[in-house]
């Protein structure tokens, strides 16, 4: 093979390798875009009751219900749960009374928390859920 053809072939290989690396980098960056940085209580403008509810949510609910996405979780996302007319999966009205019942008694695979949370803690949790 002529030296000039070898040089052209190497340049093409380098360009293809560069294009492949660029594509892999872009895909990697886009995949990371779904991950949201956790905002502080102050950034979210939470009041003391909502902050207490957020702590309860983090300890008990976040395992199955992501606040902003359902990816990789068993339960539905809680984002905008009170902006919907009906609760996801159950179809019950989305209001404080119904959500309180679900928190206390559980539903489907979700355990009830009537023996774990008192009424004030449930109210705190509801206050936080209203912010999502």
Regions found by a protein language model. Name each.
Residues 44, 48-51, 69, 73, ...:
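Residues at secondary-structure transition points
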Residues 29-32:
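C-terminal motif of bacterial Sec signal peptides marking the signal peptidase cleavage site
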Residues 53, 57-67, 125-129:
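The canonical Cys-X-X-Cys-His
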Residues 36, 67-68:
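Cys/His-rich metal-chelating microdomains
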Residues 1-27:
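Short, low-complexity, charge-dense intrinsically disordered segments
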Residues 34-56:
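Electrostatic cytochrome c docking/interface patches
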Residues 73, 80-132:
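Extracytoplasmic electron-transfer domains, predominantly the class I c-type cytochrome c fold
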Residues 63, 77-80:
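Soluble periplasmic/extracytoplasmic beta-strand elements of cell-envelope proteins
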């Amino acid at each position: 093979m002529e030296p000039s053809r070898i040089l052209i072939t190497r340049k093409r290989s380098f360009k293809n390798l560069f294009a492949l690396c660029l594509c892999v980098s872009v895909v990697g960056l886009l995949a990371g875009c779904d991950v949201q940085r956790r905002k502080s209580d102050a950034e979210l403008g939470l009041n003391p009751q909502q902050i207490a509810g957020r702590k309860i949510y983090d300890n008990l609910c976040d395992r199955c219900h992501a606040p902003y996405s359902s990816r990789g979780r068993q339960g539905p996302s809680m984002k905008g749960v009170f902006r919907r007319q009906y609760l996801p999966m159950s179809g019950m009205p989305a209001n404080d009374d119904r959500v309180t019942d679900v928190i206390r008694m559980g539903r489907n695979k979700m355990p009830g928390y009537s023996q774990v949370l008192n009424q004030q803690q449930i109210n705190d949790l509801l206050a936080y859920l209203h912010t999502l």
